[in-house]
Amino acid sequence: MKKIFFLITLISIISCEQTISKSENQILIERNNTIVSKNFESYNSGDFEVFESTISDDFTFTLMGELDISGTYSYQELLKAAGAFQSLLKNGWKGNIDKIISGVNGSVIVLSGKAEGVNGEYNNDYIWLYSINEEGKVTSITEYLSDLLFVKQLYGQEICGEKKTMEQL
């Protein structure tokens, strides 16, 4: 009985002395949250010096979809494309991070953007998919957005005819 009591006491003492440490995965996830937050906020505020400090030398930005501007861009090409995008807006674009979902190799940011396009209100929703290397640098961002809203509000093109309900189909 004394041995069992001693063993329980010893286990209790040892377990009280141990501190709970974060797993390597949890540390990487928190690091990635910080990196993508800094990266997006610098892009959103136009601080491209900070933005550039968060990306790798072989960084690419891919705009998915069927737009004439859809494709993959280097950092320098992204700067030109961002300037062209801003020219379609009356007072610039501001994005808001709605959610960040991170893993050990990257993150996803769910965004909502607000702007006044040349053809009216342009409030689009976005997904930015980030890949992050071992050095903690963003190697790629892949952006998903509504092509239809983009061409209607920024290019002034009507995409489809009269809006129909399910009952009308």
Specify the residue positions occupied by each region the protein language model found.
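Short, low-complexity N-terminal intrinsically disordered segments enriched in polar/charged residues
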Residues: 16-53, 159-169
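Hydrophobic/aromatic beta-strand elements that line small-molecule binding cavities or substrate pockets
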Residues: 95-101, 113-114, 125-132
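A short, polar/proline- and glycine-enriched secondary-structure boundary/capping micro-motif
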Residues: 72, 119-122, 149-155
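Low-complexity, intrinsically disordered terminal/linker segments enriched in charged
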Residues: 140-169
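Short, cysteine-centered beta-strand-loop-beta hairpins and adjacent loop/turn segments enriched
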Residues: 88, 115-123
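Hydrophobic pocket/interface hotspot
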Residues: 39, 50-52, 59, 78, ...
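Sec-dependent N-terminal signal peptides
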Residues: 4-13
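A solvent-exposed, acidic/Ser-Thr-rich amphipathic alpha-helical stretch
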Residues: 53-103
